[in-house]
Amino acid sequence: MPKSTDIKSILILGAGPIVIGQACEFDYSGTQACKALKEEGYRIILLNSNPATIMTDPDMADATYVEPIHWEIVEKIIQKEKPDALLPTMGGQTALNCALELDHKGILKKYGVQIIGATVDAIKKAENRKLFEHSMKKLNLETAKCGIAHNIQEAFLVLNNVGFPCIIRPSFTMGGHGGGIAYNHEEFEKICERGLELSPSTELLIDESLIGWKEYEMEVVRDKNDNCIIVCSIENLDPMGIHTGDSITVAPAQTLTDKEYQVMRNASMSILREIGVETGGSNVQFAINPKNGRMIVIEMNPRVSRSSALASKATGFPIAKIAAKLAIGYTLDELANDITGTNTTASFEPSIDYIVTKIPRFNFEKFPGCDDRLTTQMKSVGEVMAIGRTFQESIQKAIRGLEVGASGFDSKISSRDSEYLIKIRRELKDAGSERIWYIGDAFRYGMSINDVFDLTSIDPWFLVQIKEIILLEKKIIKNGFIGLKYDFFYFLKRKGFSDQRIAILTNKNESEIRQLRYKLNLHPVYKRIDTCSAEFSTETAYMYSTWEDECESHPSKNNKKIIILGGGPNRIGQGIEFDYCCVHAAQALREDGFEAIMVNCNPETVSTDYDISDRLYFEPITLENVLEIVRIEKPKGVIIQYGGQTPLKLAHEFEKEGVPIIGTSPDSIDTAENRYRFQKTVNKLRLQQPLNATVLTLDEAYKKADIIGYPIMVRPSYVLGGRAMEIVYEPYGLENYFKTTLKKNNTTPILLDQYLDYATEVDVDAICDGETVLIGGIMEHIEQAGVHSGDSACSLPAYTLTSKVQNEIRRQVKKLAFELSVKGLMNIQFAIKNNKIYIIEVNPRAARTVPFVSKAIGLALAKISVRVMCGKTLLEQGFIKEIIPPYFSVKEAVLPFDKFQGVDPILGPEMRSTGEVMGIGKNFSEAFSKSMLGAHTNMKKSGRVLLSVRNNDKNNIINLAVKLKKLGFKIDATKGTSVALKKSGISSRLVNKVHEGRPHIQDRLKNGEYSYIVNTTSCYQGIKDSKLICRSALQYKVHYDTTVNGAFATVMALNENPIKNIETLQKIHKKIQLFYTKK
């Protein structure tokens, strides 16, 4: 049947900011949905608060709202745009929950808006644990022994039936948020209390323990005629007890018998029918007891998910695109398979002749003190996917793609002391993020398959594969470099061994192994992802490398080829913003007649969609992989400046190997990143930097710190995302840094910088073509200097900087751009103190602020920049004038502290945010209020405020207290702050710090007495107190600020209604055009 004609316009809900459990896979699905429905002629209205997404580009929808995803905002959009239908299945749990709230409040019925993609009843049956269990019983499918609880008393009644250990999962949350495994009454009560707080429906599902069971997932698509297909089966290498998002997964499933697979397949289809998923994609999860084969249904998601993105990239079947078209009435047999063209339709189940492995990426090092053990609550921040002909090839490629410094199954045991076997056993039994390497060590040091299975419950089939890799490593070591004859070398490559890994094992360097391989004429071939195991020819060039005879790459003879290197797996400091730039690069190149070739290994991203570039190589971003692609494609140029540090760190090696890098040269990049070279540049230009020094020892640090003066910023050289950076206020803090943060026998130079307290930090994005510099935007940070730029909110245009200071910033940006010979994008960070401008750092590459600035000013900076890199000047493109919008845009960071209990949540120089939101308003305060709502800031507009600030902030707090009083807040203050307030005639209630006696701050927080907390600190004891306060504020959902500037911005925002004014990005950008036309 053809598409629905009674629908003319569709409102799509996005997923909002990137958070743990809900990442950029929903930008991928949302972008696919927008494109699919727009090409069918529907008017598309989009709501998403995340500016770093491709789906919020103005050309993706007819009306794009970069506003908070909140039911009242959605109602205003419905009133204004009058959509016929709402599609909530592309925006993760955020969109589903919003749709349920709209239905509950009667808004959809009131305005006659129908939900497509999934009915409200289907969402409820899938998400509500009791309804889901009832549905499974009707199908004679088992679920885990469980019970529902809505309070602690009910929870303990369920526990009597379920017993220990048990798994606790809050309803309507994502990524296992708020859940956990309880082994005793104390843990049980703690997890239940937290789960009840986080569940929107105040509901818990308490399950019997399935720890050690095998876990599987089925990606299912169904149409309105009840045609059902299994797109992909996925097997978790890690057993139940570890969240599937934190587990290594393999597709297709490797250890199911055909009978088990068919039972699971049929059950999946029956579940979709019973739940009522009439059209679209769903994910169904199963567990199998390896001892007796008992199968139970864990859960199902009636929407596209993280696994849907993985399955789409693993098979080439675009689940989100197909689901969007099914939602408007098409059937599977009416839709063509984009990969095979007219050869097959979407009703053909994909068949694959390769193995896909996904490995999650963790950032525990960013959260000292957090529990790094893997449980039912998701903790990973990204993932990598690799494709190979065998599991061994696939997993070794995935390990390399992770970018954690591993070339393969590197040993984690540095010396065989008396404890090494105990450590291996502990790491196998109580899984952390590095368990896969400890499995390698277990076999390396003599443990058997059964030993490892008993400790991990990982299926022996996988363990046999890993053990064989370790045995091969021993053989490589034994034979040495001279043993690398053609047949053995070729055999190793087919097993997934990289040049780098072989080099380590033979005690050679990578270039020596590469030269030998070239001499032996050993090169990979490229196979195509075709959905049909090579049964039909493909119309798309979506490829992976392997080691066989026939190559299917078939590169064109086009001499206008450009390779774009992506950013690999998401991590804190390098996320979706860089993928946004890579996608824009591909789009601009294709628009200008270039052949765009993408190289990346992240399955969540838009850049790895097969139709974004002309050719896609799904490969790790390593020297070996990129050189082989360059060899076969022979590009005119390679772009390394858009994928963050991942491709940049290979720049010098590329240059040595003759790779044609376009844009800013590697030498210029090194000048900016090398401390000594950059200092010379700054001095030559007669610009200013904060006082600084480089030291190796603590004694040296004491001496230099005395010269610079406390407080100082301390960090190792060459760090990413502020890694291991700290602000030190006194000699004791310096000693503590050397003892606790640095490894023993540290040989890395330590950088000391003057910390400019009370300085305002400024970010500038600009483009230089060698003749002209285009200022993209001057962003003023809301938190003062010392908070990592990625964690600070910022405003464009600047909201307090004078025009004189801004003009001087512009002058300095231009001088630096020309001196560094920048060709393309650059980002400069400044600190302003007492009207003096200090340069913090310069990055001659794309920065994480590029998407935000592009949305704020209405110019696609990444596209303009890539054209500059390809030889088109700014003048030729018509972009030479800085745009200062006649409205304000605020970018606010979203932090994951609620996922990491016990971590110090005070903001500092080490970046820890996972995502961002954008607020747009007629003035700064309105824009900031919207960004707060978009970031789910729980800010009440009345009640009692706690003020506890350091001595240096006491003068500034007076004005803040006056403003809070005017708003009707009552004030509590700690001793020193209370005295300062009293001197200025402001009354407050005195409250004790924890070490000062009871009742103290913690007691009052537990009693729900506070609506808002302002807490700044400096000294060692103050930091300890502050950590306790902020952690408690998080626990009890009280908004807090740890900088006075942040507090002033919050108070300004309290005067605004973030829901009052909404406008489309298209109209906002039109205002800019009209504004500059009138000028």
Swiss-Prot record:
In its keyword annotation, does this UniProt entry include Ligase?
A: yes
Q: Where is this region: Carbamoyl phosphate synthetic domain?
A: 554-936
Residues given in the record as Mn(2+) 1 binding sites? Q285, E299
Where along the chain is Mg(2+) 4 bound?
A: E841, N843
Residues noted as binding Mn(2+) 4 in the record, renumbered to the chain: E841, N843
* Coiled-coil ranges per UniProt: none
The positions annotated for binding Mn(2+) 2 are E299, N301
| SUPFAM superfamilies per the UniProt record, alphabetical | Carbamoyl phosphate synthetase, large subunit connection domain (SSF48108), Glutathione synthetase ATP-binding domain-like (SSF56059), Methylglyoxal synthase-like (SSF52335), PreATP-grasp domain (SSF52440)
The entry's protein name is: Carbamoyl phosphate synthase large chain
According to its UniProt entry, this protein's organism is: Buchnera aphidicola subsp. Acyrthosiphon pisum (strain APS)
